[in-house]
């Protein structure tokens, strides 16, 4: 189970008292998280999620709180930070920054179809449209420079076939980092995977886990999303799902010619980002009772993205 900081009931009760949400009925750790400690918390006046932030600089947390407030006010189904009776949103518990948020209804869709992908494309387009006019600036702590540094560190320990796949991808990232093309920007979720979306029946009911959110190219966020939601088990893209997601997104925000040009490379960049972070996590948490996602999943996807046949609607 991915709970890095266990909690005693009495400690949690004292923490929850200032929210005036009634007595604590029950709480349990959430196994799905891989970076923070998350708990389902059942109180007299509702169901909530408590997050203890285990990774990242504390100074970034006000950014996440403000971004979620902006998205909530624009009608997106996101978990915003609740305030105590004194107006505090960001607090500390067991020495860690802590946030209490409403628990959203729904479940994760492990085997999405074209309808689910259409809903996700519309959601991502809404998120970008809500923030592109007034971007809350925060560079990603796992952006292009991070990929170049970590890729160089990890490459010597990889098998020859993996190194041969990674090397040209890192060269492509270096070129992109040097060019910094003028692609349209907004705030990004930057981790919009299946386990961060909730469906209530056929309807998308929630988008969670914003702790990788940042500002940047919208195309990169779209590539991250499509790589997870529209990939087959062999790493290839499913055309029906991919086109449904892209069409729904484009209804919210049309693509530019420059985005169409950079689309294939952005899909590869998005693969590298998660291949590297999963390799790092697999080394760091080896032998521990922590959820570790398989790095090979993105190695396979990167291999499949050497030829991209699913183009943006602009380029059809």
From Swiss-Prot:
rRNA-binding found in the keyword field: no
EC number: 2.7.1.39
Pathway in which this enzyme or protein is active: Amino-acid biosynthesis; L-threonine biosynthesis; L-threonine from L-aspartate: step 4/5
Bridged cysteine pairs (disulfide): none
Assigned keywords, A-Z: Amino-acid biosynthesis, ATP-binding, Kinase, Nucleotide-binding, Threonine biosynthesis, Transferase
CDD domains cross-referenced by the UniProt entry: HomoserineK_II (cd05153)
MF terms in GO: ATP binding; homoserine kinase activity
Biological process annotations from GO: threonine biosynthetic process
Top-rank EC class of the record's enzyme: transferase
Record field: catalytic activity: L-homoserine + ATP = O-phospho-L-homoserine + ADP + H(+)
Superkingdom of the source species: Bacteria
Outcome of gene disruption: Cells lacking thrB are still able to grow in a minimal medium without the addition of threonine.
UniProt-listed PANTHER family: AMINOGLYCOSIDE PHOSPHOTRANSFERASE DOMAIN-CONTAINING PROTEIN, AMINOGLYCOSIDE PHOSPHOTRANSFERASE DOMAIN-CONTAINING PROTEIN-RELATED
NCBIfam families: PRK05231.1 (NF003558), thrB_alt (TIGR00938)
Family affiliation: Belongs to the pseudomonas-type ThrB family.
Protein name as it appears in the record: Homoserine kinase
Lineage, uppermost ranks: Bacteria, Pseudomonadati, Pseudomonadota, Gammaproteobacteria, Pseudomonadales
């Amino acid at each position: 189970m991915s709970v890095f900081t266990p909690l005693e009931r009495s400690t949690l009760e004292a923490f929850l008292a200032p929210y005036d949400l009634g007595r604590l009925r029950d709480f349990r750790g959430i196994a799905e998280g891989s970076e923070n400690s998350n708990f389902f918390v059942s109180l007299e006046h509702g169901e909530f999620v408590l997050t203890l932030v285990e990774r990242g600089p504390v100074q970034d947390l006000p950014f996440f709180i403000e971004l979620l407030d902006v998205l909530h006010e624009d009608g997106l189904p996101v978990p915003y930070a609740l305030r105590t009776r004194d107006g505090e949103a960001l607090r500390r518990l067991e020495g860690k920054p802590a946030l209490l948020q409403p628990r959203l209804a729904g479940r994760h869709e492990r085997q999405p179809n074209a309808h689910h992908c259409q809903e996700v494309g519309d959601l991502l387009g809404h998120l970008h449209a809500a923030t592109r006019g007034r971007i809350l600036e925060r560079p990603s702590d796992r952006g292009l420079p991070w990929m170049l540094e970590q890729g160089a560190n990890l490459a010597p320990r990889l098998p020859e076939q993996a190194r041969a796949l990674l090397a040209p991808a890192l060269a492509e990232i270096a070129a992109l980092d040097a060019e910094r093309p003028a692609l349209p920007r907004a705030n990004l979720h930057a981790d919009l995977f299946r386990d961060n979306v909730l469906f209530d029946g056929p309807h998308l009911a929630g988008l969670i886990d914003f702790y990788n959110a940042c500002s940047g190219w919208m195309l990169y966020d779209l590539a991250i999303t499509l790589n997870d939601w529209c990939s087959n088990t062999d790493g290839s893209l499913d055309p029906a799902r991919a086109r449904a997601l892209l069409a729904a997104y484009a209804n919210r925000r049309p693509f530019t010619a420059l985005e169409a040009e950079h689309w294939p490379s952005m899909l590869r960049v998005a693969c590298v980002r998660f291949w590297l972070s999963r390799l790092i996590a697999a080394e760091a948490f080896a032998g521990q009772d922590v959820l570790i996602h398989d790095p090979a999943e993105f190695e396979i996807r990167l291999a499949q993205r050497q030829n991209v046949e699913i183009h943006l609607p602009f380029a059809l």
